[in-house]
């Protein structure tokens, strides 16, 4: 017997996942698809140890840790943060009030909450290399331990200014809303190769980073998730979080068909991490990483970002060929803005775009 209710209205659902180490441009892709496909509901399971960036047309950079960046959607009605979220309530309120247009904000009652005690615990040290010390890991562990007195979002928000701004919902209410929504977009956090299950342990994050986990953390019902299109985000030169030599920390290895290089060697300005503001490490493209991520995440289409980074058009085409052995590259990005993303450019068009942006 089908579980789909008679009022099921979902026509399309886009899931955005990162196929590398994060910072591939998921926020840019989310903004682009939000404007292009106009979802009514945005879903996310955020954590304060990961940030998304969207550069608006006027050059203003919008950095979110708690809210998705598909807010460019002209049809947006509601943002829903699922039960797998780890919420920094102060940051959530700050981002919500800064939105260009206030829409309904729903948060699942069972989302974890970062409290000062969690930040203090992580500030004391003893964490994995690359930790942002945001309190996210400690908050998540506190939820899993299920000790008496542990506060989840539904209780914690009662004494916070968010109370009255946000709608706290249970699973049934969220399901009913999602089933009645025509178009949904869900944004993943971090990157596949940082997954605690699939990454280079212990040089990883505290949770799984796959399409399956995104679906679970957002609380998407199976009958919604099974029609989803998965768009995987990649960059021509993947990056990792910075080393912290003063603390004796190394952020981990790369794939065997990849080598570490320097931004200066590529003629590029140094990049810095969104959350910790530390210099990023950069590597050559790994086909092994791309193929593994595509298979594990069920990627249907790929967004390839920073297409102007390779030293020649031929080098860019080699990367495209490696990806398209497994999945179609549907979107190509050449810059930080939504207007720098191109949908299904031909190889001839790519030649002109590469020449223009490479200058």
From Swiss-Prot:
Residue positions of the active site: 23
Pfam families: Adenylsucc_synt (PF00709)
SUPFAM superfamilies, alphabetized: P-loop containing nucleoside triphosphate hydrolases
Binding site for ATP: 23-27, 51-53, 190, 305, 308
Origin superkingdom: Viruses
Binding site for Mg(2+): 23, 51, 274
Any one Gene Ontology BP term: purine nucleotide biosynthetic process
Residues involved in L-aspartate binding: 274-275, 280
Protein family: Belongs to the Caudovirales PurZ family.
Designated name of the protein: N6-succino-2-amino-2'-deoxyadenylate synthase
């Amino acid at each position: 017997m089908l579980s789909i209710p008679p009022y099921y209205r979902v026509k399309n659902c886009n899931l955005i996942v990162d196929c590398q180490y994060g910072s591939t441009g998921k926020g840019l892709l989310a903004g682009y698809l939000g404007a292009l496909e106009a979802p009514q509901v945005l879903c996310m399971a955020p954590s304060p140890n990961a940030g998304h960036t969207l550069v608006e047309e006027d050059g203003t950079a919008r950095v979110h840790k708690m809210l998705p960046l598909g807010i460019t959607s002209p049809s947006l009605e509601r943002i829903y943060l699922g039960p797998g979220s780890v919420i920094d309530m102060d940051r959530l309120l700050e981002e919500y009030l800064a939105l260009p247009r206030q829409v309904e904000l729903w948060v699942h009652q069972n989302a974890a909450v970062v409290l000062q005690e969690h930040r203090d615990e992580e500030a004391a040290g003893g964490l994995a290399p690359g930790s942002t010390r945001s309190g996210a890991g400690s908050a998540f562990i506190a939820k899993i331990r299920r000790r008496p007195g542990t506060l989840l979002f539904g209780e914690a928000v009662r004494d916070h200014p968010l109370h009255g701004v946000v709608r706290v919902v249970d699973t049934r209410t969220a399901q009913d809303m999602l089933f009645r929504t025509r178009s949904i977009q869900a944004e993943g956090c971090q990157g596949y190769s940082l997954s605690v299950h699939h990454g280079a342990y212990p040089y990883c994050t505290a949770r799984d980073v796959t399409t399956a986990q995104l679906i679970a953390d957002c609380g998407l019902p199976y009958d919604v998730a099974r029609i989803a299109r998965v768009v995987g985000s990649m960059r021509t030169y993947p990056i990792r979080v910075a080393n912290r030599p003063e603390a004796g920390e190394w952020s981990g290895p790369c794939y065997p068909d990849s080598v570490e290089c320097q931004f200066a060697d590529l003629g590029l300005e140094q990049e810095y991490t969104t959350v910790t503001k530390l210099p990023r490490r950069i590597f050559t493209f790994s086909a092994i990483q791309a193929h593994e991520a595509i298979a594990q995440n069920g990627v249907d289409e790929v967004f390839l970002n920073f297409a102007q980074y390779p030293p020649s058009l031929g080098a860019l085409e080699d990367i495209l060929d490696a990806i398209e052995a497994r999945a179609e590259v549907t979107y190509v990005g050449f810059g930080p803005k939504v207007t720098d993303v191109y949908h299904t450019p031909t190889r001839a068009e790519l030649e002109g775009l590469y020449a223009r942006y490479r200058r």
